[in-house]
């Protein structure tokens, strides 16, 4: 019994016959003290057993479960909780639908955003004359890359580089030996790839020349065609002709652009081949589907290299009449054998033939395969020189059939005598004939025409630049025009060139050092202009009144003013001296009024006689005379010197395009209005 009790006592204390209750046993369970101390056994140590604390059972620990379901339902059904909840729910639903509806509405009413080729100027470069990087006297691709910072400082958005393909003609124009090779004088394919990457790193775009009509007579295709080798037999236009004692009798009277017969006898094939240009430039046979596929494959090759677009040159020559009928003489009384100049025939059977536009549209479809990524639209421009305005407009395509984004507008380069009337006629001719919704463009120069300064005179260069940047559409500048470069005199040149176009291809004038800073070589492929000591980039950078500084101001104005890129254009007046027009946009009160004097003497304009509610004074935003910038002019008597131009600005709530008196003289490519409250453009106005 005691043994059992001892087992139950976890702790026992013995002190001189006293027992203390440890609190874990009942008092009655403690045995009584032995009266005989001697009979007590020696105390033995007792083990203390402390049980480990029990781990709480996981199922016993539960989170707070909240209000029971029955109670929750009791409260949630009360009106003071149910009504706010339903209001918030339906407000959320309505807000979501309103947001979706507003987004759809903005998308529907907003006009199409401007593409990159619409949003800024294009700068055309003749690569052999821009900048030499390897000291051989010839410009090259690395030279262009070195000057990209200069180009971006002009607020240029797109570079247009003319032909750089491997060519047998020394002026590297159109006689291409290999469409997939860079001519060594310009560099390597790696140089081109580096240039494309650098251009894109600067946020710029690149378009290049492409000449599908013909090749060099040294092209492998032509060499194979001469020997009737396989599929290349009909890659060119061959026809039987007689050749006796070195004298060729051609199949018909068709003439080359450069004069004389467009047929040349080939000693290998014993037939005549057709060439619209030089005999070294045989025309491809675009009635052969295999030729069209070859050209599309070349287009794909350059697009895969990162090119953003093409200028398709000489496309009106792609097809000729099948039956080889003689073309009609301009002067029917002229002896046929004396007709040798291109202008002496009507070229009804060798240009703009039925099916030509279908080929161009097919090129467009090939390019569209690379235009599907956002911001990667591929541009197509078409060269349409010497075409009537009606034929030129055909390159825009049809309402539902896409073709060129625009044909290049070179009509300013063909003005005979500069005046207010002739400038007005060029503008109205394009704007009145351009299909609805299409985009205009304006060029003042190029490698095939005399330079702007030499055509119109240095005193009108600034006014022409002001015109270029304030007209609606894309301005296109030929290298050197921004500083007023002129033609050079070329005599006794001993290479195979079209000498009439060499005058506008002189080296770019960068500074007043040797060779105008174009090259460190001892010679240049063409002579520099003798005025390069004063007409150069470095000098004009520091002159507030220089052509370069005004060009930069105008390009910046074009880039920052929505009115100039999207607004209405209203022609108000033209005479032998002046052209007056406004640029305005619905929703923006600020209006630009442009006055330009292209006459041979000074003139005075009364603008209030044209616009009755015009303020008595207007502020000059920009002027060809930098000293008058920011000042005010009397609108009843604006005095303009010869070649002077002003960009005036004022505020009005009554834009001219909404007034019946001016409505028929106003044009817009894509109708747009501005909401200042939402800071958006919309088209339903």
Swiss-Prot record:
Keywords: Amino-acid transport, Calcium, Cell membrane, Disulfide bond, Glycoprotein, Membrane, Metal-binding, Phosphoprotein, Signal-anchor, Transmembrane, Transmembrane helix, Transport
Keyword Ribosomal protein tagged: no
Membrane topology note: Single-pass type II membrane protein
Listed CDD domains: AmyAc_SLC3A1 (cd11359)
Residues on Cytoplasmic side: 1-88
InterPro entries: Glyco_hydro_13_cat_dom, Glyco_hydro_b, Glycoside_hydrolase_SF, O16G_dom_2
Purpose of the protein: Acts as a chaperone that facilitates biogenesis and trafficking of functional transporter heteromers to the plasma membrane. Associates with SLC7A9 to form a functional transporter complex that mediates the electrogenic exchange between cationic amino acids and neutral amino acids, with a stoichiometry of 1:1. SLC7A9-SLC3A1 transporter has system b(0,+)-like activity with high affinity for extracellular cationic amino acids and L-cystine and lower affinity for intracellular neutral amino acids.
Tissue expression per record: Expressed in the brush border membrane in the kidney (at protein level). Highly expressed in renal tubules in the outer stripe of the outer medulla and medullary ray (at protein level). Also detected in the renal cortex. More abundant in male than female kidneys.
Localization annotation: Cell membrane; Apical cell membrane
Pfam families: Alpha-amylase
Binding site for Ca(2+): 213, 283, 317-318, 320
SUPFAM superfamilies: (Trans)glycosidases
Compositionally biased residues, Basic and acidic residues: 1-10
Identification of the protein by name: Amino acid transporter heavy chain SLC3A1
Gene: Slc3a1
Subunit structure: Disulfide-linked heterodimer composed of the catalytic light subunit SLC7A9 and the heavy subunit SLC3A1. The heterodimer is the minimal functional unit. Assembles in non-covalently linked heterotetramers (dimers of heterodimers) and higher order oligomers; the oligomerization is mediated by SLC3A1 likely to prevent degradation in the endoplasmic reticulum and facilitate heteromer trafficking to the plasma membrane. Disulfide-linked heterodimer composed of the catalytic light subunit SLC7A13 and the heavy subunit SLC3A1.
Stretches of the chain found on the membrane's Extracellular side: 110-685
Residues modified as Phosphoserine: 385
Main location: membrane
Region (Disordered): 1-53
Effect ascribed to mutating residue 140 to G: Loss of localization at the brush border membrane
